[in-house]
């Protein structure tokens, strides 16, 4: 087996640091393990994605160490009865009766902001 690269050593170090930092925080260890397992199959050649995830992990480590974090978890959007796992519509949209995407803000009376901020 070849020697781990510098980036691999950094990722493993981050993993250990996150596990240590999350010891007293409910859900932290499970969240860290799940996140690392989810991305374990990334190809070694996808360096940009690995570096991005590494930087994101560093920021999460800073938050854990700051003492402001009381728990770690994930927000999962529950699937509605009409949604399929491979549904191509964007989050926050659903299909109207004609099959066209319908914005969920239309029913609530909330205004949808345009990309230019108006």
From Swiss-Prot:
Function of the protein: Plays an essential role in the assembly of succinate dehydrogenase (SDH), an enzyme complex (also referred to as respiratory complex II) that is a component of both the tricarboxylic acid (TCA) cycle and the mitochondrial electron transport chain, and which couples the oxidation of succinate to fumarate with the reduction of ubiquinone (coenzyme Q) to ubiquinol. Promotes maturation of the iron-sulfur protein subunit Sdhb of the SDH catalytic dimer, protecting it from the deleterious effects of oxidants. May act together with SDHAF3.
Compartments it resides in: Mitochondrion matrix
Residue ranges of the motif LYR motif 1: 14-16
Taxonomic source organism: Mus musculus
Region (Disordered) location: 68-118
Annotated gene: Sdhaf1
Region span, Interaction with SDHB: 53-65
Entry similarity comment: Belongs to the complex I LYR family. SDHAF1 subfamily.
Quaternary structure note: Interacts with SDHB within an SDHA-SDHB subcomplex. Also interacts with the iron-sulfur transfer complex formed by HSC20, HSPA9 and ISCU through direct binding to HSC20. Binding of SDHAF1 to SDHB precedes and is necessary for recruitment of the iron-sulfur transfer complex by SDHAF1.
Regions of compositional bias (Basic and acidic residues) in chain numbering: 94-118
PANTHER family listed in its UniProt record: SUCCINATE DEHYDROGENASE ASSEMBLY FACTOR 1, MITOCHONDRIAL (PTHR47046:SF1)
InterPro entries referenced in this protein's UniProt entry, alphabetically: Complex1_LYR_dom, Complex1_LYR_SDHAF1_LYRM8, SDHAF1
Keywords: Chaperone, Mitochondrion, Repeat
Protein name (database record): Succinate dehydrogenase assembly factor 1, mitochondrial
Cellular component per GO, a single term: mitochondrial matrix
Main subcellular localisation: mitochondrion
Gene Ontology BP terms: mitochondrial respiratory chain complex II assembly
